[in-house]
Amino acid sequence: MATRTICFPISGYPYCREQPVTFTWIKGSKRQNIRAVHDAVHTTDPDVSILEVSSASVQPEGEAVSSLRLLLHLDSVAQDVPISTVFEATKVFEHGGPFADLLTCEPPKVHKDTRLRTSGELLRYSLEGNEYPTEPYMDSFFEWLYCRALKQFPEKAEPLSRYNAFSDIAAAADSKKYYGDSSRAAAIYVGLAAAGKLSCIDSYELFIAEVYTEPKPLPKSGKSEAASKMTPEVSAPAKETPADELPQPDNANAEVIPDAAQMEHILELPKAT
């Protein structure tokens, strides 16, 4: 038996809901395994429209957004590079990396590079002069790269909106270190698009703030914390001084300004209760 995760986009934090699916693994047949995964999903929900987002997908729109096919434009090499290649080439290990030379290599050669498995523990990612952590959100860098690529190439992203679930047969728990999970990244993108939040993809920090940071609940009054801080405090009303105790003006001909009691009478306003 094997387990894969099905990812469902949602139009609000955290933009993706995950559901593990168990199925019988058939060795050496990715497409049969994909069919088994989808059949397992449809046994509980036959109306789910699911897309496999890997190079083994039978659906052209799914193959087009696999990490081996989906491209990200990098100014540093002045070309479009497969997401899987960017992800591997930017890894920084204890004893090596990043391996910028891999950015211009074909994906099969990249994944066979022994440096990716013999350089010690993965510490972080480094891309075009910027550093990205592996903790506390170990999948966030891959997901951000994937979403950036979809935003750069909207013709690849548009067909995804027709699906409400995604799978990635390559994204087993023991292989995520090397491949990432395209199904989760695709679901997050669709969720962000539905919520009108694609602008958060423009920077890694904004992406983390939107996708990985749970929104604070509003106060019970319904006002946000910021709005509450902006509301000025109301001072206690000043004690009213009797009219006969008010200081008299030096100029007897000066205009007399009515006090509060007189103003109420003049304007015929009801007194506050």
Where do the PLM segments sit?
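Short, extreme N-terminal leader segments that mark the start of a protein/domain
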Residues: 1-55
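A structural signal for the main folded, soluble domain(s) of proteins
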Residues: 3, 33, 44-50, 76, ...
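Compact, well-ordered interaction domains used in eukaryotic information-processing assemblies
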Residues: 50-52, 57-71
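A short mid-domain helix/strand-loop element embedded in enzyme catalytic domains
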Residues: 147-170, 182-184
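Active-site nucleophilic cysteine motif
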Residues: 175-189
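Long, well-structured alpha-helical subdomains associated
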Residues: 201-234
